[in-house]
């Protein structure tokens, strides 16, 4: 009846094990409305100058500067030696060229030169041009050499490995001639394209007269766009050749393929690197040029100006040569991490280092 106790089992404690704490080793589940303590993903491994994942623009540029900080003896030593040789040769060439021009000046001023004098003047002008051209060619070769050396240092530095000059040269030596061939092929191709473009514009001018202005502008603009497009697509051909050990044509194909879908990004990074190197060069050369101008004001000799030009070339080269090459090398590595998941291979290489510091970059057939 009313007020009687409930039947047995009603309201009693639950059976053993029901609602009790779990046995040791089992975690309790979170209550309703509670969330598990999710944290941020672990950072990407960074054994060297950049993290092993697709890079942001700032990380790429900072990595180029970090190359100098990570191995200053080798990087700055190579840059100093190569820049010194280039500066000395170009300074001598400029001095000899100016001396030839001084010798030709009296004939040009008189205006009454004989045929023999005009011939001598033309020969002097040709000698002046050659005096500047030959050092410029050697300086170009030295720049190609520096680019290859610094690209190798970048590839090793990404994995946290520091190479000395001998190790770097041993890796580059069998790739130097192909690297020179690649540079010449691209340069000759660009020169030929410009020559064809100029020939078309001149032909339009002869054929259409004043009406050739608009077609000529269209040809010039179209040719310039095509050259810039090809330059960006081939921007990482040198790193592909040096690091992967492929041939000249294969390196151009590799660069063209890696830049697919990233053309605007590659262009932006190249422009940004160019602006930075230009600013660095200006900061270095302007004070030297000002001092040389003041020194020239107290002397009629051109020697202070020539020496200042050589010194500016030397100092600017020490800074800009490794930075420019490092940007190109890191851009190549970044493109491969984005398209080919190279970062996974590099992580494995960091765990199991090999005698060849660039072995992780070789593509497996």
Question: What is each residue range found by the language model?
Answer:
Residues 26, 31, 37-111, 115-119, ...:
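N-terminal membrane-targeting/anchoring modules of bacterial envelope and secretion proteins
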Residues 63, 67, 174-186, 258, ...:
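Membrane-embedded alpha-helical bundles of multi-pass transporters/translocases
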Residues 89-136, 194-227, 281-320:
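Membrane-helix interface segments in multi-pass membrane proteins
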Residues 31-34, 234-243, 270-365:
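Juxtamembrane transition segments at transmembrane-helix termini in multipass membrane proteins
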Residues 37-51, 125-164, 211-251, 303-339:
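Selective recognition of hydrophobic, aromatic-rich stretches within alpha-helical transmembrane segments
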Residues 1-51, 354-365:
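Intrinsically disordered, low-complexity Pro/Gly-rich regions
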Residues 43-98, 225-303:
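Nonpolar helix-loop interface/hinge motif
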Residues 80, 84, 137, 180, ...:
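Residue-level signature of the transmembrane alpha-helical core
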């Amino acid at each position: 009846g009313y007020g009687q106790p409930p039947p047995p089992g009603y309201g009693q404690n639950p059976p053993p094990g029901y609602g009790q704490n779990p046995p040791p080793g089992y975690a309790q589940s979170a209550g309703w409305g509670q969330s598990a303590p999710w944290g941020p993903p672990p950072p990407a491994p960074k054994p060297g100058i950049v993290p092993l994942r697709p890079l942001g623009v700032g990380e790429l540029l900072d990595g180029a500067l970090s190359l100098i900080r990570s191995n200053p003896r080798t990087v700055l030593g190579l840059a100093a030696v190569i820049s010194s040789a280039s500066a000395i040769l170009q300074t001598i060439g400029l001095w000899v060229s100016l001396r030839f021009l001084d010798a030709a000046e009296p004939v040009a001023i008189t205006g009454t030169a004989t045929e023999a004098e005009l011939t001598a003047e033309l020969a002097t002008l040709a000698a002046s041009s050659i005096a500047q051209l030959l050092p410029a060619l050697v300086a170009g070769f030295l720049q190609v050499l520096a680019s290859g050396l610094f690209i190798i240092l970048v590839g090793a530095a990404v994995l946290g490995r520091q190479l000395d000059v001998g190790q770097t040269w041993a890796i580059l030596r069998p790739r130097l001639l192909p690297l020179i061939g690649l540079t010449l092929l691209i340069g000759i191709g660009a020169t030929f394209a410009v020559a064809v473009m100029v020939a078309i514009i001149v032909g339009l001018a002869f054929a259409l007269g004043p009406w050739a202005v608009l077609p000529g502008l269209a040809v010039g603009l179209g040719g310039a766009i095509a050259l810039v497009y090809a330059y960006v697509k081939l921007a990482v051909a040198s790193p592909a050749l040096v690091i992967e050990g492929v041939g000249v044509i294969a390196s151009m194909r590799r660069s063209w393929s890696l830049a697919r879908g990233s053309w605007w990004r590659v262009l932006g990074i190249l422009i940004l690197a160019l602006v930075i190197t230009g600013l660095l060069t200006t900061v270095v050369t302007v004070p030297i040029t000002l001092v040389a101008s003041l020194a020239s004001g107290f002397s009629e000799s051109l020697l202070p100006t020539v020496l200042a030009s050589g010194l500016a070339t030397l100092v600017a080269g020490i800074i800009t040569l490794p930075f420019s090459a490092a940007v190109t090398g890191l851009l190549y590595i970044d493109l491969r991490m984005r398209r080919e998941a190279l970062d996974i291979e590099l992580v494995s290489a960091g765990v199991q280092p090999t005698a060849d510091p660039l072995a992780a970059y070789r593509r497996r057939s």
